[in-house]
From Swiss-Prot:
Keywords: ATP-binding, Magnesium, Nucleotide-binding, Transferase, tRNA processing. Its EC number is 2.5.1.75. Pfam families: IPPT. Monomer. This is tRNA dimethylallyltransferase. InterPro entries: Dimethylallyltransferase, IPT, P-loop_NTPase. ATP binds at G9, P10, T11, A12, V13, G14, K15, T16. Catalyzes the transfer of a dimethylallyl group onto the adenine at position 37 in tRNAs that read codons beginning with uridine, leading to the formation of N6-(dimethylallyl)adenosine (i(6)A). Belongs to the IPP transferase family. SUPFAM superfamilies: P-loop containing nucleoside triphosphate hydrolases (SSF52540).
Amino acid sequence: MQKVVAIVGPTAVGKTSLAIEIAKKLDGEIVSGDSMQIYKEVAIGTAKASREEQAEVKHYLVDAHSVFEDFSVKNFVDEARSAIGEIAGKGKLPIIAGGTGFYVNALLNDMQLGDKEEEAASVDPEWEVFLAANGPQALWEELNKKDPEAAKKIPVANSRRSLRALSVISRTGGLFSKQQAEIKPRYDYLIIGLNSDREAIYQRINQRVDLMMEAGLLEEARFVYEHRAGEHQVLQAIGYKEFFPYFAGEASLETCVMALKTASRRYAKRQLTYFRNKLPVEWYDPLTDPNCANRIAVRIEEWMKEEK
């Protein structure tokens, strides 16, 4: 089974720089595990590796598509798998670096995924009718009756996930939670998580936002705002939608910058929750341990020798 390293963690913890350092130490190349870095029109708000950094180590799935293209998690997995194959074909180590937990999980594990049309087709019309007539709470309660374990992991408000779970139960006669538990690894992977003291992370987030503003984030956000017609994924990205009230004349720039800092801190918290609950992560603190990169490199080298 192909060995793959993933470097994950909350925003602003230093994943990009550490991934580059590890890639240089261990002859690796990097696949972005970020749902927004794929888009070529936006760079500042997505915190991509700089051109200089990308020149040091080859990156895949950065600037690969336009914001005006549909790009689903299934598309991501397909292209990332191709990139991993290309990297491995050179005899190099594939390194996934990014903070979009669901994307990383879907790549590393053989999860059932579909594009928007396939996903819509996978929903049982009977349950769609039930949702329309009774609402999200009643739909979730039906799921809770049939599969309490699945219901525990699905928020009441997330009707799309409740619909999918109920549809799977109806079609297979089995528990959705059991089928989810049977997801099999696609690779032999090691997941390195970066984290530090919460206040230190929050301070780095605030500093990053200030630096992004100096680098031209407002104009990038204006581009997104001016092209907001349609259902482009980038419209929902943290770093852009927070400025929409400013462009609409409904809020001051200072208020929007503060909103971005708050949203980024909340996002960091959600990222950590996902990684802790969904993936087997080995955690390191790059902010307080000056030898962190070396320790991680040694751990990866040890793991590379293990048979599976």
